């Protein structure tokens, strides 16, 4: 952008300086910027601060009336309502900052608007093109490229060291070096591994020998045993039932009685 199109004069550029230190405590805004400041103050008050304060005060009064907020014993609900109004006023002002920035950026001959535009463009470009234009990113990527090239050399060196190790220390497979031994010889110091190999295979044999095998009991055998027991107990029951009957069937001898009706024996 040229000086004629932007409206900047050399004096203005010297006064405001570079983009980094453009605005200091001695900056004097232009008439257009003052007008935008007044518009932002009035619009932020009527469109944001006043509605937000009214809503906050109304909500606080409702909460105090319903008992959700306890009023002060000395001042009542006034402190809470005042705090809600101040909070709504500040929140409304802060919410209108973005709109004011847009208004300043629309000004053509405003150093403040130009600074805001450059700051936004710089922020957007840093977010969009940071991996492409950041010099530190290229330096940070160099160790990654070196690490990509290193695995091939590391693999080759690892294979060489492994081959040298295997040539120095030969070994055999477990099936070739270990031979199975009986369980009795497994308790020697030379064969601790054989104990683990023989125990699982020989333990079931000893368990089977200790436990006697039981023949399955058939239903017919149980039935015959019950019949034998019943036949043995049946005569005993018959004898016990016949004894009372024999006693009942024996007639009693009539004793002689005297004239008074008493029985007496000779």
Curated annotation (Swiss-Prot):
The record's disulfide annotation reads none
**InterPro entries per record:** OCAD1/2, OCIA_dom
Any idea where the OCIA domain is? 1-114
- Where is composition skewed (Polar residues) in this entry? 135-155, 179-188
Q: Does the keyword Cytoplasm apply?
A: no
Which Pfam family would be a valid example here? OCIA
Query: Biased-composition ranges for Basic and acidic residues?
Result: 250-266
Give me the Gene Ontology terms describing cellular component.
endosome
Which residue ranges does the record annotate as region Disordered? 127-213, 225-266
Composition-biased stretches (Low complexity): 156-178
Protein's cellular compartments: Endosome
Keyword terms of this UniProt record:
Endosome
UniProt lists the family membership as follows:
Belongs to the OCIAD1 family.
Name of the protein in its database record: OCIA domain-containing protein 1
Q: Which organism is it from?
A: Danio rerio (Zebrafish)
What's the name of its gene?
A: ociad1
